[in-house]
């Protein structure tokens, strides 16, 4: 696994051995960041279910201002910190929160934190034909505090398996879907942003479509 673009491109990142971790594939990361383009530059980033930190490190390499990473596993969080050192970034631009994602979301919302990008590629759920998904991806979509954490015009980029049929609550608006193999990366904006001028900046480059990998 490596950083695919920016000033730390081609740096090889560590992946914990013997642990249930599923890093976002390099081809998927490239597709995501090609779509995001200059939106990453200067952004304050929040990565949920951060694991090795691959997505937030990719953001920092491509010009993001700072990143907050939430990861429940202390062993994964230690690998994340090691990858941060490998990438050569200044320590003050990264905050690692070793805690449950949903506890962290509540605390960040109460603190009034805001982010230009929220990234999450959580562990996949089971196939859910004929019933509502119970996956982590669905739980994130259902979490009412999450859209509150987005700056005006901000985006949530959410990974899930194509077997996971998600229900998108009314406070989100789908902007784009990227597909590669079994992976889907879904771009969403808070519904409040699609009702004002900020939506124009999102919808023009992020018209909903599907790209097959």
For each predicted feature, which ranges?
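Class I S-adenosyl-L-methionine-dependent methyltransferase catalytic core
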Residues: 1-213
């Amino acid at each position: 696994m490596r950083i695919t673009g920016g000033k730390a491109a081609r740096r090889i990142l560590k992946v914990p051995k013997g642990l249930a971790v599923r890093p976002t594939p390099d081809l998927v990361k490239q597709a995501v960041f090609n779509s995001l383009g200059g939106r990453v530059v200067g952004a304050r980033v929040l990565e949920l279910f951060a694991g090795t930190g691959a997505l937030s490190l990719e953001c920092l390499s491509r010009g993001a201002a700072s990143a907050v990473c939430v990861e429940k596993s202390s062993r994964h969080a230690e690998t994340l910190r090691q990858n941060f050192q490998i990438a050569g970034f200044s320590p003050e631009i990264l905050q690692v929160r070793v805690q449950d994602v949903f506890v962290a979301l509540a605390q960040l919302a109460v603190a009034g934190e805001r982010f230009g990008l929220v990234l999450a590629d959580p562990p996949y759920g089971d196939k859910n034909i004929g019933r509502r998904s119970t996956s982590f991806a669905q739980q994130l979509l259902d979490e009412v505090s999450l859209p509150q954490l987005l700056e005006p015009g901000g985006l949530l980029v959410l990974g899930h398996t194509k077997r996971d049929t998600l229900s998108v609550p009314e406070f989100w608006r789908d902007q784009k879907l990227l597909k590669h193999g079994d992976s889907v990366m879904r771009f969403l904006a808070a519904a409040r942003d699609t009702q004002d001028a900020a939506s124009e900046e999102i919808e023009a480059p992020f018209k909903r479509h599907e790209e097959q990998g």
